């Protein structure tokens, strides 16, 4: 992970979304940066423990559960992928299916996403409305 990737992801967020919309799930509820960082760290721990099997057990499976958490985590990972690749859009649950992708790359994406969420995610609803 480099600081440049985190800075670029923040720049992309400001272009892609008005305000802090990326941090609200489909229900409209705010998801804090700390919560997303915890979700991504837990996903990485699960992949380390259970193993990564593209197409069978990957990002889609370890992020499954609460819809708000899934969608915001997906948006954070998309920002990081696009910051790395220069792409205009990316689907993280397809990114980990690319032939030649390694578990190390998947774990690095999750770590970078968690770092981005801790660094740039809102701490509370008051922070978003400010």
Feature locations, PLM:
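Charged, low-complexity surface segments at secondary-structure and domain boundaries
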Residues: 19-30, 60-64, 90-99
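Short terminal alpha-helical segments
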Residues: 6-54, 110-114, 127
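Amphipathic alpha-helical binding modules
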Residues: 82-130
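Amphipathic alpha-helical interaction modules
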Residues: 49-80
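Non-catalytic, well-ordered alpha-helical scaffold segments
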Residues: 41, 57-60, 104
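Alpha-helix boundary/N-cap detector
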Residues: 27-38, 68-76, 97, 101, ...
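N-terminal leader and targeting sequences that precede the mature domain
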Residues: 1-4
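Short, flexible helical or helix-coil boundary motifs
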Residues: 13-19, 47-50, 66, 70, ...
């Amino acid at each position: 992970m480099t600081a440049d990737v985190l800075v670029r992801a923040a720049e992309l967020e400001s272009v892609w979304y008005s305000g802090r919309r990326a941090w609200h799930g489909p229900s409209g509820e705010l998801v804090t940066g700390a919560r997303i960082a915890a979700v991504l760290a837990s996903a990485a721990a699960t992949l380390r423990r259970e193993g990564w099997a593209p197409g069978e057990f990957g990002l889609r499976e370890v992020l499954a559960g609460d819809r708000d958490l899934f969608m915001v985590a997906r948006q954070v990972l998309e920002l990081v992928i696009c910051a790395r690749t220069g792409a205009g859009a990316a689907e993280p649950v397809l990114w980990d299916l690319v032939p030649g992708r390694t578990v190390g790359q998947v774990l690095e994406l999750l770590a970078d996403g968690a770092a981005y969420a801790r660094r740039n995610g809102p701490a509370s609803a008051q922070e978003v409305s400010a």
